[in-house]
C-alpha cells in the first residue's frame, strides 16, 4: 500500500507540473492593434503578403479571439476564435478558423450578409510580448458556394453548324427577339453581334480558372491601342466562310501572333456561386497597390459626366451600388463540361434604360462632329468607324436603338466556356 500511494503521489505531481506548464498567462499577451504598415505585423493571405491592415488578439482566462481588419480581401473585419499555446519565453502560437456567411464585396463598406456559408477562413501564427505578430491566413470557397464550378474553363472555340448553317454556338453569343416590325432587326443583330463579339473575344481571352481558395485567374491578351482608327466593317458572309475548317465546323481561333498573359493568383479577384448566380468580385484595394488608381471617387466623377450627357443617374446609381456590394454578377448554366455565364433582359434592363435618355443627345453630338471641319484626323477615323458599325447593325443614328429595346421580348448575352 505505501508503494501504491507513492506511485499515485508521483503521478499526481507530474500531472500538476504538466498543467502548470500548459497554462498561459493571458495578461502577458499584447492586446493592442498591430499594423502591417508598421512592420510589426507580418501577414499573408493565400501566400500573398498583406501591405495594409492590422491584426489584434483579445484573450482572457476562457478564450481568445483574433481580429483581422482589412486583411481578408472583400471583408472589412474578420474575427475568429483561436487556440493559444506557449511557444517559449515571451512567445505564443495560435491557430483558428471561421466560416463567413457575409458575401465579399468590391468596397468593404458595402459587405452584406448572405446564407449559407460562402467562405471558410483559417489562420495560424505567433505573437510575442514585444508586440510583433505573424499571421498566415488562407481562404476557401465553401463546398456549397463552389457549385461544381471549381477548375479551369477554356473559351469555346469550335462549333458545329446549326439547322440554319450558322454556328450552333459562339464564344460570345447574343440571343435577341423583338416584337412586330423590330423582329427582323433583333434577329439580324443576334447574328452580327455574336459574330463580331466572338471574333474580338477569341483574340483577347483564352481561359479562366475558379480556384478553390476563391481566387480567379485568367489568360488574356493586353489591349492593343494601335490601329483603332483603321476599323473596316467586314462582310458577315465572308467572315463566316473564313471560319469554316476542313472538318466542316466553325473555328474561332486567336490570331497567329497572340501572346497570352496570365493573371497571377494574387488575390486580385475572388468568386463564389450562390442561388443560381456566379459572382466575380474584383479586389479594388489590391488593384490600387498594383497601379490601378480607380476608386469610388473616380466612379462618382464619371457619373457626373454621364448625367450631363443625359443618362438617368437615379436608375444607374442603385445598379452601381449593387455591383459594389456583390461584384460582377452573372447567371450561369453548367452541364456536361460546358459553362455559360450570361446576363438576360431582366439583368440588363435597368442599365440600358438608364442610358436610353442620353441617345438623342448623342445624335446631336455626332452630327456636330460630322459637320465640324476642324476635328482631328483621329476623331474623323473614330466617327467613320462608329458610323460603319451602326450601319451594319441597322441604325442610322444612336436613338434608333430606343424603340428597338422598348419592343424587345427576350435578350441574352453569354460567354461560352468548356472544361479544360
Q: Whereabouts are the PLM-identified features?
A:
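Surface-exposed or flexible loop/turn and strand-edge residues in extracellular/cell-surface modules
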Residues: 11, 38, 52-54, 122, ...
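Tryptophan-anchored aromatic micro-motifs
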Residues: 25-49, 139-197, 217-219
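Beta-sheet ligand-binding and adhesion/scaffold domains
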Residues: 95-148, 262, 277-279, 286-420
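A short, structured loop/turn motif at beta-sheet edges
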Residues: 60-62, 85-92, 128, 272-273, ...
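N-terminal glycine/threonine-rich, aromatic-flanked beta-hairpin/loop signature
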Residues: 50-81, 166-290
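Central antiparallel beta-sheet cores of small beta-barrel/beta-sandwich binding domains
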Residues: 64-105
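Bacterial Sec-dependent N-terminal signal peptides
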Residues: 1, 5-38, 124, 130-151, ...
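Generic short beta-strand segments
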Residues: 38-43, 69-71, 95-106, 155-164, ...
Amino acid at each position: 500500500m505505501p508503494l501504491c500511494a507513492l506511485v499515485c503521489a508521483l503521478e499526481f505531481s507530474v500531472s500538476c507540473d504538466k498543467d502548470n506548464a500548459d497554462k498561459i498567462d493571458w495578461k502577458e499577451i499584447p492586446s493592442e492593434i498591430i499594423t502591417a504598415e508598421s512592420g510589426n505585423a507580418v501577414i499573408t493571405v493565400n501566400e500573398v503578403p498583406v501591405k495594409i491592415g492590422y491584426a489584434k488578439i483579445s484573450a482572457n482566462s476562457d478564450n481568445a479571439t483574433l481580429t483581422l481588419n482589412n486583411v481578408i480581401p472583400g471583408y472589412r473585419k474578420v474575427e475568429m476564435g483561436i487556440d493559444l499555446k506557449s511557444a517559449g519565453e515571451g512567445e505564443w502560437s495560435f491557430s483558428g478558423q471561421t466560416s463567413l456567411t457575409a458575401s465579399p464585396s468590391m468596397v468593404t463598406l458595402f459587405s452584406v450578409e448572405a446564407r449559407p456559408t460562402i467562405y471558410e477562413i483559417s489562420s495560424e501564427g505567433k505573437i510575442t510580448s514585444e508586440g510583433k505578430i505573424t499571421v498566415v491566413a488562407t481562404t476557401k470557397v465553401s463546398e456549397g458556394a463552389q457549385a461544381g464550378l471549381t477548375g479551369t474553363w477554356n473559351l469555346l472555340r469550335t462549333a458545329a453548324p446549326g439547322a440554319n448553317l450558322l454556328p450552333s454556338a459562339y464564344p460570345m453569343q447574343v440571343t435577341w427577339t423583338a416584337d412586330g416590325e423590330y423582329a427582323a432587326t433583333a434577329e439580324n443583330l443576334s447574328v452580327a453581334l455574336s459574330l463580331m463579339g466572338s471574333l474580338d473575344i477569341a483574340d483577347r481571352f483564352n481561359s479562366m480558372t475558379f480556384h478553390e481558395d476563391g481566387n480567379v485567374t485568367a489568360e488574356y491578351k493586353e489591349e492593343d491601342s494601335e490601329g483603332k482608327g483603321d476599323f473596316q466593317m467586314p462582310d458577315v458572309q465572308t467572315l463566316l466562310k473564313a471560319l469554316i475548317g476542313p472538318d466542316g465546323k466553325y473555328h474561332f481561333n486567336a490570331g497567329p501572333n497572340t501572346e497570352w498573359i496570365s493573371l497571377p493568383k494574387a488575390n486580385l479577384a475572388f468568386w463564389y456561386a450562390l442561388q443560381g448566380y456566379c459572382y466575380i468580385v474584383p479586389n479594388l484595394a489590391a488593384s490600387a497597390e498594383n497601379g490601378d488608381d480607380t476608386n469610388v471617387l473616380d466612379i462618382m466623377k464619371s457619373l457626373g459626366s454621364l448625367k450631363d450627357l443625359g443618362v438617368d443617374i437615379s436608375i444607374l446609381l442603385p445598379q452601381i451600388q449593387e455591383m459594389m456590394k456583390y461584384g460582377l454578377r452573372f447567371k450561369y448554366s453548367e452541364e456536361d463540361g460546358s459553362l455559360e455565364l450570361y446576363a438576360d433582359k431582366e439583368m440588363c434592363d435597368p442599365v440600358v434604360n438608364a442610358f436610353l435618355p442620353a441617345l438623342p443627345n448623342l445624335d446631336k453630338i455626332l452630327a456636330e462632329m460630322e459637320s465640324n471641319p476642324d476635328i482631328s484626323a483621329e476623331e474623323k477615323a473614330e466617327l467613320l468607324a462608329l458610323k460603319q458599325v451602326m450601319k451594319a447593325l441597322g441604325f442610322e443614328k444612336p436613338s434608333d436603338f430606343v424603340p428597338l429595346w422598348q419592343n424587345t421580348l427576350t435578350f441574352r448575352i453569354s460567354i461560352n466556356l468548356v472544361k479544360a
